[in-house]
Amino acid sequence: MISYHVQQMGGSGKVVFNQRTGEIVMTQYQGSCFCGAVKFQVSGAPEAMGYCHCDSCRRWSAGPVNAFSLWPYDSFEVLAGADHIGEFHLTEQSYRKWCKKCGGHVFTDHPALSLMDVYVANLPDLAFEPAVHVHYQESVLPIRDGLPKMKDVPAEMGGSGDTLPE
């Protein structure tokens, strides 16, 4: 029988170890809205992390850029407050979710991709390791960090796959 050990990380993150081998089996991160009514958890590793510069994300986040982490549906779970989640569809590609009690934006469902975009600011224990900028053609804040700057999104996500210079 395999025995597992759960170790609390700083904050709400957890690492699950195989006690026999010491191998990390799974990492879990928890997040919430401002008031804590909506709580959620992601497990494992995100499919991608980066920055989105699209007009929609900028307006939704009220900032010049949005830091994202994309998770497969089976890695994402609402732990509490599902009845407090509001939803807005500007496009069929993005179903934006927020807490109806405090107004805090929590995540965006991308049904065509079967991915949940959990805003990095809502996962305080996640080590943010951005790999790409998407929708950079819409950028209002040029960032020179050496990461690829996608005109829209990667081809495997339905975009052109074209990159732009820094």
Model-derived regions: residue spans:
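A short Gly-Trp-Pro
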Residues: 3-166
